[in-house]
């Protein structure tokens, strides 16, 4: 799924293999959330990402099961309908998981390629949401033990800091979430640390948090099921 903040609401879009593309929104991320809305009944779509431009136009990026291609649709401003059949803007090796971001006139598509455990992170950029797009590999496993790195998204903070949110595949642990340091050079994101100076960043395990908090929360790790509510919630 993708979660975005627009028009004073949080929006979540996701696909299921056989049922289609769904949307829900909420003023508060803890809910209540609107009833699921079926945007389009369709099979084998995946990784949808909504995007609202400054001019009020709305779009949706997505891919297909089997990894790719990357397709952009025009979408109604209320997120309830797709307005066309979509345009393919990129085809690559196992290209999927697109996340759309705009900065300084550039549209950026963050896409993983090469497979969940063996791939890398690519950024596409263009002055037009339909392309043509320039391509740059911005993050790879390299000499680290953080494979993938997969399904990344650009994150900005209210005070102007930047970070990159992604996961790695870790067998029994599943998909382990990481937050990488990020800054901009020549209108390209620079992510992690370029240890071997090949122009491509590598993930790090330790970095300065973009937002500091002195409050430490320990996640719930067990439940004795003594009440009607789950402790994990």
Where are these regions (language model features)?
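Carbohydrate-active catalytic/glycan-binding domains of CAZyme proteins
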Residues: 1-233
